Regions:
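Membrane-interfacial segments at transmembrane helix termini in multi-pass membrane proteins
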Residues: 192-214, 252-271, 309, 313-343, ...
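Small-residue-rich segments of transmembrane alpha-helices in multi-pass membrane proteins
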Residues: 34-46, 90-104, 150-165, 209-230, ...
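Membrane-interface junctions of multi-pass transporters
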Residues: 24-28, 42-88, 204-304
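Membrane-interface helix-loop-helix junctions at boundaries between adjacent transmembrane segments
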Residues: 107-121, 130-178
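Helix-coil boundary and interhelical linker segments in multi-pass alpha-helical membrane proteins
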Residues: 1-6, 45-56, 102-116, 164-179, ...
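Transmembrane alpha-helices that form the ion-translocation and gating core
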Residues: 24, 82-141, 283-288, 296-391
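Transmembrane alpha-helical segments of multi-pass membrane transport proteins and ion-pumping complexes
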Residues: 11-19, 23, 37-41, 45, ...
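Structural signature of hydrophobic alpha-helical transmembrane segments
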Residues: 1-13, 32, 53-70, 112-128, ...
Length: 481
């Protein structure tokens, strides 16, 4: 017990320091989960050996994973996913999956069929549950980029989890996995409908949960954790992926609870999860990363990073350009949305942990894949800056003009260089103005919210102009009197 408490204290210390380190980077472009994973790998048995596996920490880690994906499941709106944007998000994920399967076959990684499937699925994921609070913090809700993340990102989390549940049970055939999965879904639907009926009937238990939701007993929060733990236990008994059980708990809560009550409850669940269990999940899961194995094969690591970007970001960007509801989005918003949908580190951690546990993937390869996920998150800010510069200079237009009139190539290059300098001056001026207003944005956030921020700035200038005009009119009127 003393050893476990000491390890937990160490983990929480690095969690606090990781959050502080993430806050020091202007615009906070790197999520703190990257720092959690780095801390776990550093403290684990393959590096410093400060923390090691234990039953108590393993249980806390499993609860953290459950709370993380319960929140993600609650944030998914099935009615929106059934709409046009959701269907297009599903089509995009299917394209990503086909590309990932082809890339996995070409790489010839020496994995079993289940291992190859797990690897391919990991390349197609989006950590939607992690992006939701990031969207909230960066005020992306209601923007075009936020809408894309809600459809494409949600499908990029839901469909990989379902695929993993079907393909990753070492003890059953795929047909048996599908049958068990259908049975599990039926049980969850029955629980949700039973909860709805109980809420509508308003029995004594329902009244107790509602009346004591804000008291010291926190009855509704306790009932929520009961639902989560019960579904995790059921999934373990049925040999299903625990991520699926956590998703199901979120779906049930969204269906049973009224919206206002659900938001209040979710805030408490997030406080419990983000305060303790979710960071422990990331640090503890990253503990098994074999740093030596990652360093021994840098070419494979670079290949995995490139695949994560090409297999997910590129198809999302092309689909946004192809489908009618997103075709007219500015290029910067498409780039930002595609790169946000590529952020998959938390789900990669969960999926590789499940794959290693099922014996479908060696721990060394899982280590490389998790590190690739972390590096892809680090690369995204660089790519957004490159994209912002490319959008400002219009290189395609410049190439077309040079091809049509080669003798004026120097003049064309000079014109586009001046355009870039002007765009850079405007970009830094706008960011400086936003910083004075207390808003700090990364390049990805700037691309996502550029139009909205310009409109807001223009409205503020108009307001100031009208206010000054009104004050001048009042001053003139007072002088006349």
């Amino acid at each position: 017990m003393t050893t476990e408490l000491a390890m937990l204290a160490t983990m929480l210390a690095v969690v606090v320091l990781s959050s502080f380190a993430a806050s020091l980077i202007p615009g906070r472009p790197i999520p703190e989960v990257v720092f959690f994973v780095a801390a776990g790998a550093t403290l684990g048995p393959h590096c410093l050996g400060v923390i090691h596996a234990s039953q108590g920490l393993a249980l806390m880690s499993r609860l953290g994973m459950g709370i993380l994906f319960l929140i993600a499941g609650y944030d998914l709106d099935l009615r929106e996913l059934a709409g046009r944007a959701g269907r297009h998000g599903a089509v995009c994920w299917a394209i990503c999956m086909a590309l990932a399967a082809a890339a996995t076959a070409l790489l010839d990684l020496g994995l079993s069929m289940a291992g190859s499937a797990a690897f391919a699925i990991a390349l197609t994921t989006t950590a939607y549950g992690t992006l939701v609070p990031i969207m909230r913090d960066r005020e992306l809700g209601g923007t075009a980029v936020g809408g894309v993340i809600e459809s494409y990102g949600a499908m990029g989390e839901l469909l990989p989890v379902v695929a993993m549940s079907i393909m990753l049970s070492p003890t059953r055939s795929m047909a048996a996995n599908i049958a068990v999965l259908v049975g599990f879904v039926v049980v969850c639907v029955m629980v949700a409908r039973g909860g709805e009926r109980a809420r509508n009937l308003g029995g004594r238990l329902v009244r107790f949960l509602s009346d004591n939701a804000e008291t010291s007993s926190q009855a509704l929060l306790r009932a929520t954790l009961l639902l989560l733990v019960a579904l995790l236990a059921l999934a373990a008994a049925l040999d299903l992926d625990a991520v699926l059980a956590a998703f199901a708990a979120g779906f049930i809560l969204r269906r049973v609870l009224p919206p206002e009550q659900g938001k209040g409850l979710l805030a408490k669940v997030e406080a419990v999860g983000n305060g303790l269990f979710i960071p422990v999940f990331f640090v503890y899961s990253a503990m098994d990363i074999d740093v030596a194995a990652v360093g021994a094969n840098p070419a494979l690591l670079a290949t995995f990073v490139a695949l994560l970007l090409l297999v997910r970001a590129l198809p999302v960007g092309l689909c946004l350009r192809a489908f009618p509801e997103t075709r007219d989005m500015p290029a910067g918003e498409k780039v930002s949305a595609a790169l946000y949908c590529t952020m998959a580190l938390p789900l990669i951690v969960a999926l590789t942990e499940a794959a290693v546990g099922a014996g479908a993937m060696p721990s060394a390869m899982a280590s490389v894949l998790v590190c690739a996920g972390a590096l892809s998150v680090l690369v995204i800010p660089v790519l957004t800056n490159i994209s912002r510069v490319a959008i400002s200079t219009s290189p395609v237009e410049a190439a077309q003009r040079i091809a049509a009139s080669p003798e004026t190539a120097r003049q064309i290059v000079h014109e586009h260089h001046e355009r870039l300098r002007e765009a850079e001056r405007a970009f830094h001026a706008e960011r400086a103005e936003l910083r004075r207003e207390g808003v700090r944005l990364s390049a990805a956030d700037y691309l996502a919210r550029a139009e909205e921020l310009r409109e807001r700035h223009a409205r503020e200038l108009r307001r100031i102009h009208e206010q000054n005009k009104h004050e001048i009119d009042e001053l003139r009127e007072s002088r006349r009197k």
